[in-house]
């Protein structure tokens, strides 16, 4: 039996304006102070951001002064396309981008004398961690507990160790703090990982010193926090970005981590729209912090709108799911 040929067809983007309900329209027309938009899946939070961006562009605002932050490169690309399809204005910068893309662009805005930044890939970082672990094995396993000795030889352990460093960094926890927490909680693995983390950071510094290309290699776990530090150390650059991005919008804020929220706090002005749904966070595995969502939203609750109309799911199904989560 012959197989039927198939092709992957990209979803056709809609160029027509969305029909907004009264709650959505209130968000789109809001100006002058931060606004928090809450709503479940299918209530049109992302639609609100697209329409709010387009409304400002149609009023004459420079598209390059609007920054729409989201999670995932594919989602950012979809948002850029949805907006570009309905405006003829030229955009010199990506209007929608991820926090990591924004952070890297900030680090590329170097102060005088700063080296060119290069972002290490995940596989590069894991490979380097494996090299250091191999050295630990040759040195008699250093601080590693005996029940982890066999694990040190595996790729999976290097991957888990990298993930621990990522998650800790996103929460503003450094190696010293991790060691302290390990001692307080009686977590011997944390203490061993903290000691390794210090060796890892020291070896990264030595690599930078011995590198021939005079470029700054950035650990992915430090990317967003380094961008915040860079802005604090360069107040003129911070003022430049705050003046450039007069409107900031954030989609899926529940997927953010503490480092990303800190960067947003530095950049945000008065024209700020944040969309969130605490019930649908799916990124805990990569550092999302939905448990801290309410506290993170508090500084921006000058006005709050809850979207109640569901356009993508049956209302009964949505209600059952929401009640179950509650």
Identify the role of each PLM range.
Residues 71-76, 153, 309-315:
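Acidic, metal-coordinating catalytic cores used for nucleic-acid/nucleotide bond scission
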Residues 307-326:
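Helicase-core coupling region on the C-terminal RecA-like lobe
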Residues 112-198, 304, 310:
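ATP-hydrolysis module of ASCE/P-loop NTPase motor domains
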Residues 1-115, 119, 239, 319-322:
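P-loop NTPase Walker
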């Amino acid at each position: 039996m012959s197989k039927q040929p198939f092709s992957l067809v990209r979803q056709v983007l809609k160029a027509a304006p969305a029909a907004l309900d009264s709650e959505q329209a209130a968000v789109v027309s809001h100006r002058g102070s931060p606004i928090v938009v809450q709503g479940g899946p299918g209530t049109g939070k992302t639609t609100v951001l697209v329409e709010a961006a387009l409304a400002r562009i149609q009023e004459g605002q420079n598209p390059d002064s609007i920054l729409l932050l989201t999670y995932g490169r594919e989602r950012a690309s979809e948002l850029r396309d949805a907006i570009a399809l309905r405006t003829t204005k030229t955009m010199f910068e990506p209007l929608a981008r991820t926090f990591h893309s924004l952070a890297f662009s900030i680090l590329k805005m170097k102060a005088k004398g700063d080296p060119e930044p290069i972002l290490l890939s995940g596989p590069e970082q894991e490979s380097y961690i494996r090299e250091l672990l191999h050295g630990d094995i040759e040195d008699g396993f250093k601080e590693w507990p005996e029940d982890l000795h066999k694990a040190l030889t595996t790729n999976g352990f290097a991957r888990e160790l990298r993930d621990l460093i990522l998650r800790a960094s996103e929460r503003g926890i450094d190696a010293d703090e991790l060691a302290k927490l390990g001692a307080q909680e009686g977590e011997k693995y944390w203490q061993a990982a903290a000691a390794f983390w210090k060796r890892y950071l020291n070896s990264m510094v030595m690599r930078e010193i011995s590198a021939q290309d005079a470029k700054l290699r950035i650990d992915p776990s430090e990317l967003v926090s380094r961008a915040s530090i860079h802005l604090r150390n360069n107040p003129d650059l911070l003022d430049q970005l705050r003046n450039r991005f007069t409107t900031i919008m954030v989609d899926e804020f529940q997927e953010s981590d503490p480092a990303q929220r800190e960067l947003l706090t530095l950049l945000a002005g008065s024209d700020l729209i944040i969309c969130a749904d605490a019930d649908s966070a799916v990124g805990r595995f990569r550092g999302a912090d939905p448990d801290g969502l309410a506290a993170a939203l508090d500084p921006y609750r000058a006005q709050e709108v809850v979207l109640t109309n569901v356009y993508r799911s049956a209302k009964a199904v949505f209600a059952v799911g929401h009640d179950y989560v509650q």
